[in-house]
């Protein structure tokens, strides 16, 4: 199984945490030191913990489990979507709607509405409406697609979530915790690792770092799919 190399992590800036004044003391075990008032993450620890996370994700993927990738910050949005689609998995890459997991029955109704609107937009229904009516429905379709497009075919709650950024995705993590859904997350030095089953200490802001994590996970799931 491919793991994350120290060299690749250094090149991607995985080791750069936040300014020391913003740190969360609970991240102390994962910090190597300080450079120019910036916390430096211990990449040896990250390598070990990333491998542990990969092993567990591999088990879930091998059982055809559903993994929900969550990355709503700008730096993660496109990579999260690309990774999930490449892996035939699921994603939320815009705003996390409160209750997306804990109020799944209501979310399921919204997904049905999204699918109905998709059909109407393709079967000529929109063309039969006035311009104003069609515009209103098209806006609704776009909004629903942005919010729910990545989970519209999930068919139920995920078997795990992978969050890019523990602080930014704290609502998703809290909902997963309340439902007993395993949480994998990139956790930076300013974040609280509590409630995360598989902590991956690392920079959660740099696009290169985010791409590195997700590319390795994507490759692992692809290999798994080819071998089953």
From Swiss-Prot:
One record GO biological process: translation
Presence of keyword Signal: no
Any one Pfam family match given in the protein's UniProt record, by short name: Ribosomal_S2
Example of a GO cellular component annotation carried by this entry: cytosolic small ribosomal subunit
GO molecular function, one term: structural constituent of ribosome
Stored CDD domains: RPS2
InterPro entries xrefs: Ribosomal_uS2 (IPR001865), Ribosomal_uS2_bac/mit/plastid (IPR005706), Ribosomal_uS2_CS (IPR018130), Ribosomal_uS2_flav_dom_sf (IPR023591)
Alphabetic keyword roster: Ribonucleoprotein, Ribosomal protein
Family: Belongs to the universal ribosomal protein uS2 family.
Protein name per its UniProtKB record: Small ribosomal subunit protein uS2
Organism: Blochmanniella pennsylvanica (strain BPEN)
